[in-house]
Amino acid sequence: MGMRMMFVVFLLVVFASSVTLDRASYGRYASPVDRASALIAQAILRDCCSNPPCAHNNPDCR
């Protein structure tokens, strides 16, 4: 293979991996760790919003 062809193959691999990584940040393609983090954050916020002193200091509860 010539240098030009190797460069084109390299660019195709980089492009394909960047598209795959971009998809990983969306809903059903999200990793289990991301989903777990979101669920934990929702649980903490729900508990905080049910507590009046915490809800008063947290703008997400309003």
Curated annotation (Swiss-Prot):
It comes from the Eukaryota. It is found in: Secreted. Expressed by the venom duct. GO terms for cellular component: extracellular region; host cell postsynaptic membrane. Coiled coil: none annotated. Alpha-conotoxins act on postsynaptic membranes, they bind to the nicotinic acetylcholine receptors (nAChR) and thus inhibit them. This toxin selectively inhibits nicotinic acetylcholine receptor (nAChR) alpha-3-beta-2 subtype (IC(50)=845.5 nM). This is Alpha-conotoxin ViIA. It comes from Conus virgo. The lineage of its organism: Eukaryota, Metazoa, Spiralia, Lophotrochozoa, Mollusca.
